[in-house]
Amino acid sequence: MTLALLHINDHRLRLAAENGETLIETGFSHSDHQGLVSGSAAYETAWTKPHLSNNRFWHELNQKPLARKLKYARHHADMAYAQLCKMLASISSPQLLLSVPASLENEQLSILLGLIKAVPAEICGVVDGALLAAQPEHKLFLEIQLHQAVLTQLETTGENQKISTHKKIPKLGVS
């Protein structure tokens, strides 16, 4: 088993393994004649082939049929699965600590956990990304995603930190 941290943010997904390997990919997917391409390769073709590209699949992670049919993806979960497979392929028997944004809905988290299990990878824990990144003196944490930002208010009691509230700020993303 190789322990790794997988941080989910549709602007930049980060995978950091205990063996020192780090992988960063943007949340873009592109359908070509061989299958789904993700990350920077998909980002580079998004401008020339927008009808075959998607950058909303992490933000809108679901199993609803795509408006435009693609040969290798029925829904956003297929695109997320392809990207997870690509990212985790280099790690032998991954055991993941999953860092997710507060904006992830319960249904989306359920889909994500199922996708990771199908890769296959083992999940050893799930933590809110704001809690993982914040220092004890931080009261607010702003995570900027591709399509939105999430402002998380943190509460510190002694050595413990917890989330008191979070707010999604639509259209305040990188895109």
Language-model features, listed with the residues they occupy:
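Short clusters of small/polar residues that mark proteolytic maturation junctions
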Residues: 41-42, 165-168
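Charged linear interaction tracts used for macromolecular binding and regulation
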Residues: 83-84, 117, 138-140
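Extended hydrophobic/Leu-rich segments
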Residues: 98, 123, 150, 154-157, ...
